[in-house]
Amino acid sequence: MDPNCSCAAGGSCTCAGSCKCKECKCTSCKKSCCSCCPPGCTKCAQGCVCKGASDKCNCCA
């Protein structure tokens, strides 16, 4: 389980704006939920999908 979320590590979940998931993939989340979003990315506020490290996620795609 992700210590900061209600989903299994490596699994996917729907996160609230205050979520701080780190071990799972957020299928629906706000900027504060995605630790892989680079700072200053304007598109992050519109939601993103984290798939791993910052160089492997499409938060700003």
UniProtKB/Swiss-Prot annotation:
Sequence positions that bind a divalent metal cation 4: C33, C34, C44, C48
Gene3D superfamilies: Metallothionein Isoform II
Segment forming the signal sequence: none
Lineage: Eukaryota, Metazoa, Chordata, Craniata, Vertebrata
Binding site for a divalent metal cation 1: C5, C7, C21, C24
Keyword hit for Metal-binding: yes
Record note on domains: Class I metallothioneins contain 2 metal-binding domains: four divalent ions are chelated within cluster A of the alpha domain and are coordinated via cysteinyl thiolate bridges to 11 cysteine ligands. Cluster B, the corresponding region within the beta domain, can ligate three divalent ions to 9 cysteines.
Residues binding a divalent metal cation 2, per UniProt: C7, C13, C15, C26
Keyword Metal-binding listed: yes
Protein name: Metallothionein
Lineage top rank: taxon: Eukaryota
UniProt-annotated binding residues for a divalent metal cation 5: C34, C36, C37, C50
UniProt function note: Metallothioneins have a high content of cysteine residues that bind various heavy metals.
Keywords: Acetylation, Metal-binding, Metal-thiolate cluster
N-acetylmethionine modified-residue sites: M1
Gene Ontology terms: biological process: cellular response to cadmium ion; cellular response to copper ion; cellular response to zinc ion; detoxification of copper ion; intracellular zinc ion homeostasis; negative regulation of growth
Entry binding sites for a divalent metal cation 7: C50, C57, C59, C60
PANTHER family named in the record: METALLOTHIONEIN, METALLOTHIONEIN-1G
Provenance organism: Balaena mysticetus
